């Protein structure tokens, strides 16, 4: 696909004279364009749901969720991956973000990194990619060689693959087994795909990881019951989670958390089933960590 023919490289009539308007009008133009992004994502919800189901199946079987991207797309993958351990208590290696050019590229532009097919393949080799893993290639344009080569390599290994781009029929979309293509149109600043396209990608990644964690029992109701208390804010959040899930008071919630070494799931089952920490943990283990199953089946 030629660059000049891509939707993400098109000229946006709504912002054609944005350099001549007031600062407030400038903000309104950008905001009006941003409002279209959730609608574009809404149109591909069935594709996102299909990807979540596949990711969950693979991760449940011992696989990992691997994000692969360059520039903004790569940084968004790293952002999503890095938030999973503290939010959901998973091991850091379960959700992995890879960016063309390596760690240096997180904060700096690395010339030519996105054009390196070898880079995409080697980065996947270096993390020991296996057929159990799911590789999600992220590229607004859908033409990034680093991502395309990585997806091709992953498919050769037998991995399930997902391609996220904002141009229909792109190489990323056709290379991956599952395509998620929120078409957000031309950017306010022509070609600046960190804007609407980046926002769409972030929304999709939010759904992929959150959907995976919900289906993995990491959420009870709408509470993040595997949150790790790494700071005072999260310490308080744990107490509030136990309170909201059980109806107990703050003192009871804190006492239960202390008794089970600050594991929200165990504390919730302790309070709701009137159990000690050891028995609550045992029952959770018997039901794969799903609070709902412990409550419904016992």
UniProtKB/Swiss-Prot annotation:
Keywords: Carbohydrate metabolism, Lyase. NCBIfam families: N-acetylmuramic acid 6-phosphate etherase, PRK05441.1, PRK12570.1. Its EC number is 4.2.1.126. The keyword Ribosomal protein does not apply. Residues 55-218 form the SIS domain. One of its GO terms (molecular function) is carbohydrate derivative binding. It comes from Shigella dysenteriae serotype 1 (strain Sd197). Induction: Induced by MurNAc 6-phosphate that releases the repressor MurR from the DNA. Repressed by MurR in the absence of MurNAc 6-phosphate. One of its GO terms (biological process) is 1,6-anhydro-N-acetyl-beta-muramic acid catabolic process. Pathway: Amino-sugar metabolism; 1,6-anhydro-N-acetylmuramate degradation; Amino-sugar metabolism; N-acetylmuramate degradation; Cell wall biogenesis; peptidoglycan recycling. This is N-acetylmuramic acid 6-phosphate etherase.
